[in-house]
């Protein structure tokens, strides 16, 4: 059980650091809301610790430390930090499969490498780790292990991350980061390296953004078919999360896909309206027949997450994939230290 003092720290972290999720979480039942806030607080702290350091060597070191912290959490001896203790309680109570938070750490390792993503599949592989894994963990918190529900939760995670990528193109470029499919950029005559050196809201970059958001919209649409597989009192919160993040893409579109000179956002009032609308939508959709699209196969990039969550593999050793990612970072760290 999560200590109340730790829970209060987690609530404050999300209230001030993730407005969209905080708004959606308000309509989740308490039995899911508090563990979800603890999960998101751990993810937020982990992301900030990697994102806020400047030098590549420091980012690599931050990811390596996170790997050790996750090891301690699954060993039942979390570090003396509220988010670690709270997440350790969640892991124990809900039998959280270790592959899911490990996937998140692998995504952070990719961030630390400064990796580029050449194809849509590459972008989805990254989004699977930093967002779809969280969607699968949310299903675990709702005590849902149905593979179809997990696949649709992963669709939602992919779509939400694509919305974030589309919103943050300019901000990321100015920080030397690039998450758009570079082959799409090349098709538009955009040299990725030149774009990072001087990001401009050209017609080509707007078309790439529109294309990515169209893909996100298709995933949001398919994800919505899975809401019926969730506990009734959880449906409004999950629908709200999807609507709030989809609204980010709508704001980007409203700005004619200029994500370089402006950063799209939704107002607090708009978020609250979407939350209220989701409560009504959840009731209405419960009266409709289940869509056959709910049974669609998971995207190949998230299949391992669906499998891990469905089969309750709680305490494996560190996965070979994560070990490889961490070893690559260690080697890179040593190389940077020698420069």
Swiss-Prot record:
InterPro entries in the record: Isoprenoid_synthase_dom_sf, Squ/phyt_synthse, Squalene/phytoene_synthase_CS, Trans_IPPS_bact-type, Trans_IPPS_HH
Any GO BP annotation: carotenoid biosynthetic process
Note describing how the cofactor binds: ATP is required for the transferase activity but it does not seem to be hydrolyzed during the reaction.
Molecular function GO terms recorded: 15-cis-phytoene synthase activity; geranylgeranyl diphosphate synthase activity; metal ion binding; squalene synthase [NAD(P)H] activity
EC number: 2.5.1.-
Pfam families named among the record's database cross-references: SQS_PSY
Highest taxon above the source species: Bacteria
Requisite cofactors: ATP; Mn(2+); Mg(2+)
Transferase keyword on record: yes
CDD domains: Trans_IPPS_HH
Key words, A-Z: Carotenoid biosynthesis, Magnesium, Manganese, Metal-binding, Transferase
Pathway the protein acts in: Carotenoid biosynthesis; phytoene biosynthesis
Broad class of enzyme this protein falls into: transferase
NCBIfam families: PhytnSynCrtBRhod
Similarity comment: Belongs to the phytoene/squalene synthase family.
Job description of the protein: Involved in the biosynthesis of carotenoids. Catalyzes the condensation of two molecules of geranylgeranyl diphosphate (GGPP) to give prephytoene diphosphate (PPPP) and the subsequent rearrangement of the cyclopropylcarbinyl intermediate to yield phytoene.
Protein name: Phytoene synthase
